[in-house]
Amino acid sequence: MAKARPVNLNAEMTFAEAASVTVATRSHELFACADRVLDTEDIERVHDMRVASRRLRAALEVFAPCFERRAHKDLLREVKQLADALGERRDPDVQIAGLRQLREELPPSDHPGVDLLLARAREQQSAGNTALREALEAVLTHDLRGRLEELARP
């Protein structure tokens, strides 16, 4: 898992200033994870981006009073939708990794059953990847990054 980027806060900051810095940092962290997130061979990318989306969501929720209500509500909803799509893709990734390990531990006579489960998990992974691709396209179409940057501007 990617370690959280430090947020440069200090005791002299107002709550609103802390909100700006925190949301900007967490937003940057989220989009830094986007590279190769659709690669089904590198499942840690999805995990890292999902964790980053949770951190951003938490920051948006904690600092809600600092932002214009409508813009905040829309952005929080979109971050949640992205997190849901990341989860839809991540869950089968975890299943596949577990099933691969289980297959290695079982006798060959049990492999066909595990192979069937692996095939189903791969189908779910593919469907999750499609949902994630669509969510990422929506992020670009609706300029989520730019709107988060605008929200975080002091």
Over which residues does each language-model region extend?
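Function-determining surface determinants
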Residues: M1-P154
